[in-house]
Amino acid sequence: MILGYPGRTNRWMPANGIEQNVKYAYPAWVEGAKTGMDNMKKFMTKDATVNLQYASKYASTANYWKNRQGMIDALTKAKTAQTKTKEEAKFNAWANKAENKAKYGDVIATINNYYAQTNLKARHDNYLTQLLRTATYGTLPASLGNGLIAYAKENEAKRAEMLPRLTSAIDGAYGSLYAPLEKEVLTAQLNLYAAKAAEYGLAPKVAEMKAANNGDFTNDVHKAVTSSIFTSKDAVLAFLKEPKVETITNDPLYVISNDLMTKIRAKSPEQTKADDDFAIAFRKLVEGLRESKLNTIQYPDANSTLRLTYGKVRALPADKRNDAKINNYTTMTGMVNKYKAGDAEFDLPARLLELNKAKDFG
């Protein structure tokens, strides 16, 4: 029996929502995350300090990268979207009966139209989100830069009040930043974003740069980091002594970062209306499925609140490398049998292997 906070679930998601995730959103997430991880890893494997600095970011990215690929595989194998499609066809027939049509008649059409309208946006937003998650130069110049602009516009008294918070933010931002790594990650992510998300429409400045560089941002990023104040903590601190708004607004990394952040936050009136229409239709779908008894799910999705779960703990699939009597825990023998030199998950220290061979367990 487990008491805990399970995060969120989407068991009521419609068929086309699942299709959108499997074909548009999650593949973009997986590729974007892998691009960030690969370029982080190039530097992490060469320097123990960098490895420590980026371990948390890498692990967090890898966690969701595995999750999204696992979701693609599982949903495809289980044919979940096809099952939902059949269920929704039955619901649509029920919804268009005379006694139900006024309330439920347009629910499926509204939902399907929404996903058709947002498939490309889902792909675009996931590529851009992974850029922003893995590339500090994608977010920091805009977030910190806007604070510096506000600082520059104030009088001396107000600046003195703002200074401690800004200094603290700068210390936090640059405490574990490794500039060569960040340059590589931003370059790779801009190349990927410009290549894969263009069908929906890129951030305007990025689209302008792509037209001039044929999709290779290597030189653009090199020029930007060479002349930007945001690649150096000392340069940002120096700005605080002589603050000028134009120093930030003309900074090349700020221009790119602000362009990306503006794009991910943008929402047109048409998109707002589509979101509102979908929200209403989805609530009606859930209500109608429960009323019609066409769905076996009779409980709400998890919403990050405390839940109780109970049942049996099943063992993992049998593995001849694991000598555990029940395959739900790991032994030293199992670890050694799974040992792979140089592998990120299954490498082991040479000293541990020696101690195990000598049966020296302390």
Features from the language model and the residues they span:
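Terminal presequence/propeptide segments associated with secretion/organelle targeting
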Residues: 1-362
